């Protein structure tokens, strides 16, 4: 059985392995991850939800909320979501998104948003609609190696 909950300090090491499985051009060091994990856990505007099966993490979602004039209130943004290949199509992603939406609703957010390259059908099935394109630019201290 899968349980979805907010991350605790006890999840730090196991979550690093999932974070490192996320497809990204910039690998994360253990020190950088640890600093970010602790900062996010202490930040009331950040959310890290984890999916647990038999005491093992099988997925996670990281997001945050911020105020946005266009939304006339707070917006919740999904930074990243990852589900292990062995758990795909089992509802884990849907459960993680539901947990994030609950967190956002309880925080008073007026909408939630995200960017995706390959999971558009998944988000449409959850009721999300395409609104805009996604652009990014690495800054001098964030260039991929």
Where are the language model's segments positioned?
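Conserved acetyl-CoA-binding loop-helix of GNAT-fold acetyltransferases
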Residues: 83, 89-102
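Glycine-rich phosphate/pyrophosphate-binding loop shared by adenosine-nucleotide-utilizing enzymes
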Residues: 2, 55-60, 76
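A short beta-loop-alpha structural element at the N-terminal edge
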Residues: 2-15
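Conserved beta-strand in the GNAT
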Residues: 50, 56-65, 82
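Conserved active-site alpha-helix within GNAT-family acetyltransferase domains
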Residues: 94, 106, 110-112, 116-139
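A short helix-loop-beta-strand connector motif used in the catalytic cores of GNAT acetyltransferases and
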Residues: 40-50, 77
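Conserved GNAT-fold acetyl-CoA-binding loop/helix
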Residues: 16-38
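Conserved acetyl-CoA binding element of GNAT-fold acetyltransferases
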Residues: 73-85
């Amino acid at each position: 059985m899968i349980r979805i909950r907010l991350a605790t300090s006890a999840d730090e090491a196991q979550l690093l392995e999932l974070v490192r499985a996320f497809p990204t051009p910039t690998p994360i060091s253990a020190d950088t991850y640890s600093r970010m994990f602790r900062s996010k856990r202490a930040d009331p505007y950040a959310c890290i939800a984890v999916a647990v099966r038999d005491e093992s993490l099988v997925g996670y979602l990281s997001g945050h909320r911020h105020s946005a004039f266009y939304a006339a209130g707070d917006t919740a943004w999904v930074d990243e979501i990852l589900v292990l290949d062995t758990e795909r199509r089992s509802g884990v992603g849907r459960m993680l998104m539901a947990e994030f939406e609950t967190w956002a609703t309880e925080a008073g957010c007026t909408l939630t948003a995200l960017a995706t390259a390959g999971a558009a059908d998944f988000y449409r099935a959850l009721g999300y609609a395409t609104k805009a394109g996604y652009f990014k630019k690495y800054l001098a201290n964030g260039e991929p190696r």
